Amino acid sequence: MPRVKGGYVARRRRKKVLKLAKGYFGSKHTLFKSAQGQVMKSLQYAYRDRRQKKRDFRKLWITRINAAARLNGLSYSRLMHGLKLAGINVNRKMLADLAINDEKAFAQLAEKAKASLNN
């Protein structure tokens, strides 16, 4: 039985892995075996962090809204409840943007939330 080396198929597979490993430290970007392990781990991190990014941004928006709400005499939860009672449907991303870039508009929303909480 003749020896089979794999030919261009194996070379193509290895080149694909080494291309993904470009820029890695040490032997992880030159040696196939260590590169393959690192590429697999990197893809796992990428998959996990694409989901975690959504959570992280939501946390950031809530922190910013809470800070701005406290400057206007409300807590985050009371502000959100007041906005819901007032029928103002604004998502957290937009509220956080208003809190940073347009403090007057955010203050007006906070006043409307306060008014709807008092009624």
Curated annotation (Swiss-Prot):
One protein family per Pfam: Ribosomal_L20
UniProt-listed InterPro entries: Ribosomal_bL20, RIBOSOMAL_L20_CS, Ribosomal_protein_bL20_C
An example Gene Ontology biological process: translation
GO cellular component: ribonucleoprotein complex; ribosome
UniProt cross-references to PROSITE patterns, sorted A to Z: RIBOSOMAL_L20
Key words, A-Z: Ribonucleoprotein, Ribosomal protein, RNA-binding, rRNA-binding
Residues annotated as transmembrane: none
GO molecular function: rRNA binding; structural constituent of ribosome
General function of this protein: Binds directly to 23S ribosomal RNA and is necessary for the in vitro assembly process of the 50S ribosomal subunit. It is not involved in the protein synthesizing functions of that subunit.
Family: Belongs to the bacterial ribosomal protein bL20 family.
Name used for this protein in its record: Large ribosomal subunit protein bL20
